[in-house]
Amino acid sequence: MSLKSFIARKWAAYIRKKIDQWASDPIVTQEKVFLSIIQKAKHTAFGHDHHFEEIHSYEDFVQRVPIRDYEALAPYIERVKKGEENILWPGKPLYFAKTSGTTSGAKYIPLTKESMPYHIEAARNAIMCYIAETGKADFVSGKMIFLQGSPILEKKNGIRLGRLSGISAHYVPKYLQTNRMPSWKTNCIEDWETKIDAIVEETIHENMTLISGIPPWVQMYFERLQQKSQKTVGELFPNFQLFIYGGVNYEPYRQKFEHLIGRKVDSVELYPASEGFFAYQDTQTQKGMLLLLNAGIFYEFIEADTFFSENPKRISLKDVQLGVNYVLIVSTNAGLWGYNMGDTVMFTSLKPYRIVVTGRIKHFISAFGEHVIAKEVEEALAETLAQQGGEVSEFTVAPQVNPPAGELPYHEWFIEFEQAPKDMEAFAHTLDQALQAQNSYYKDLIEGKVLQRLRITPVPKGSFAQYMKSQGKLGGQNKTQHLANDRSIADKLSEK
């Protein structure tokens, strides 16, 4: 065992103990965070507008601070962008994390001197939890790669802005600097395909032990490595031990990854976002990610089924239940208040509080009242691949509301197969049965002859990468939408 590995084990045990302390007293931990951020922001413009000086309890907060999405918060954000101070949080933010995804264009999410350290600490602690539980620490002596956006930052009215992953690249701890790849020069390449090729050249002969990134883009990296070397990733990197990922559900990609690697590797899931680092997988033995309760973020939840009603009920952590699909609402030490993340989560454990991300509140299919969510299609596909074989590179699902005359409507699955199943008919049947098992409304519609069984439309290799490229979303933090209630993606994929 190297000295670095020995120190990592000792440090991991210490970090795990600290985590267990706040996780064992979750409600008090959240109460402290809540009172702290309210007190800190009392004299901001937002605090004055919403009478923070009168807020002494969660009930007070609910009465004074409505739920907002980015568009509703934008007037305050615009003032911050113009250089005004003390708007959402004392002073000015250190950075704006620039993300895509609103009707009005890019989002500018503030990162403050109080919030930024938690982003870095959470990523580190996820690794520490893995070491503390498994005792595996040899990977810290090898090379590590973090597939991320360009670290080149712009500046606007004294505030730097860029992609969150690019901003985070400026905070890599000193003890990782010599292990970290790719080089700064390569990391600054904007074009994703050019960047991947450069990363392959830099890493192909290195001792890679930890690889991190969003699964579809790591998959592209692995495929390029295999094309160049004619070897599996596991043969190229015999000491590759840990895959760290976030952004999308890994299960639909797992078989493909294991084929590319040539063996199984341990994995750790993260739940980072520009708005905050919310959770990470703290154990290899239980489902879900530990919700980070002491990270300057106060959490609220709204049942997804009631979210679009006139006055949906907001609850704090103490009232959540297992197995209920909730919309995640956050208030943070970066100046977001009652902020609708748009993500849906479900608790898998209440001691400690662990969650899985189930999808996006706007990403669903309910053209016929079925309200199928991302988690359901992803789990149905993973189950089908396990039963029927095949490998999937990427997929999306859309409703076909207007089929040819005389036919019932159906869900159309556009799947890019790396390796097609031997029997596509059996695959489609198993997939439909798996989705019915996931969603009782869908099952009722099938049995009631409102819908016919789903159909699979295989698309050529590279179709999804081409689609993402056409949208200016190839690489980085961008993710393929796995289902939609319209056919905007489906129609693009159907174009000849």
Briefly describe each language-model feature range:
Residues F96-P110, I456:
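Conserved adenylation A10 loop of the ANL superfamily
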Residues L111-E133:
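Conserved structural elements of the adenylate-forming
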Residues E85-N86, G105-S115, E235, L242:
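Non-catalytic, beta-rich accessory domains that mediate macromolecular interactions or localization
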Residues I109-L111, K156-N157, E223:
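Short, solvent-exposed loop/turn and secondary-structure capping segments
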Residues M1-E53, F61-R68, P75-R79, G83, ...:
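Active-site glycine/GP-rich loop and adjacent strand/helix microenvironment
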Residues K81-A97:
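Conserved pre-ATP/AMP-binding loop-to-beta segment of ANL
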Residues Y130-K174:
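Conserved AMP-binding loop of ANL adenylate-forming enzymes
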